[in-house]
């Protein structure tokens, strides 16, 4: 049996990068249902088809129910549709919500003084208001099952880097909102945690830091362990915590390097 056997999971931003890597890992861990959400239907449907080909960890397990929903998480109407379609697919049962969808805004990112207001609002709507509305809409179903909410944050939401504009501000807000949700939901059995995945070799990170060498960054698949932990019953007593996904990856990389050096 996989670590996520019986779990129904909704993931936003699932058509590429970290979201796609999480969806694949969750399927391999035996999730009962996966609702994958992203803006572009063509990319999303390719991921859905990939997931359907993944062998389950044991007979009778695996992602038996997969739904792909093209939607914009900056739209309140789209969010209502996403949650309604997900609950319809899973017969009202939702165990895990992963708020992963994100945008960095204009590239290169302008300084705050020069930031267009409409672009600023779009980033906040996607990175902060969207997760708030997803939690708000999904929460009644999750309270019934003592679910897990995982918000994907950033180091830019923990340290005020110059030049990161609306993105950093939105991630600061997401960390604060995560702490508040965790406190307010503590008595309900729903846990809320947030994860800083670090720099990864994804399209978004390459656009954000074009001067850096992306081959030195982690691949998204390498940092999924913490998400499996938080989605599983292993974390049933963990809430209100911030995790850094790459700590595990870096320690594994160090051990691999040490082994090679001794040969």
Label for each model-derived stretch:
Residues 15-16:
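Conserved glycine-rich cofactor-binding loop
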Residues 135, 170:
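Active-site helix of classical SDR
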Residues 187, 194-198, 202, 210-253, ...:
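C-terminal helical subdomain
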Residues 140, 182-184:
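Alpha-helical segment proximal to the catalytic Tyr-Lys
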Residues 154:
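Residue(s) in the substrate-gating loop at a strand-loop-helix junction
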Residues 31-47:
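Conserved glycine-rich Rossmann-like NAD(P)H-binding loop of the short-chain dehydrogenase/reductase
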Residues 108-112, 116-121:
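Substrate-binding pocket helix/loop in short-chain dehydrogenase/reductase
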């Amino acid at each position: 049996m996989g670590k996520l056997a019986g779990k129904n999971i909704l993931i936003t931003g699932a058509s590429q990068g970290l979201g796609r890597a999480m969806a694949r890992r969750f399927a391999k861990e035996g999730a009962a249902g996966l609702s994958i959400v992203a803006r572009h239907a063509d990319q999303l449907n390719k991921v859905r088809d990939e997931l359907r080909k993944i062998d389950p960890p044991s007979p009778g397990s695996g992602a038996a129910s997969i739904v792909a929903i093209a939607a914009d998480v900056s739209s309140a109407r789209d969010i209502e549709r996403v949650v309604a379609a997900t609950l319809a697919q899973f017969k009202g049962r939702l165990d895990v919500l992963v708020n992963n969808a994100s945008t960095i805004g204009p590239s290169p990112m302008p300084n705050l003084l020069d930031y267009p207001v409409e672009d600023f609002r779009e980033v906040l709507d996607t990175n902060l208001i969207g997760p708030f509305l997803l939690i708000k809409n999904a929460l009644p179903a999750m309270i019934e099952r003592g679910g897990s909410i995982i918000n994907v944050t950033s180091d830019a939401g923990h340290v005020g880097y110059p030049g990161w504009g609306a993105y950093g501000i939105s991630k600061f807000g997401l960390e604060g909102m995560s702490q508040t949700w965790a406190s307010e939901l503590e008595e309900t059995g729903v846990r809320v945690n947030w994860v800083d995945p670090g720099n990864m070799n994804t399209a978004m990170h390459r656009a954000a830091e074009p001067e850096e060498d992306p081959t030195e960054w982690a691949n998204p698949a390498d940092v999924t362990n913490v998400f499996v932990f938080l989605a599983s019953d292993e974390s049933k007593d963990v809430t209100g915590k911030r995790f850094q996904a790459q700590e595990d990856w870096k320690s594994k990389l160090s051990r691999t390097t040490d082994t090679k050096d001794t040969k």
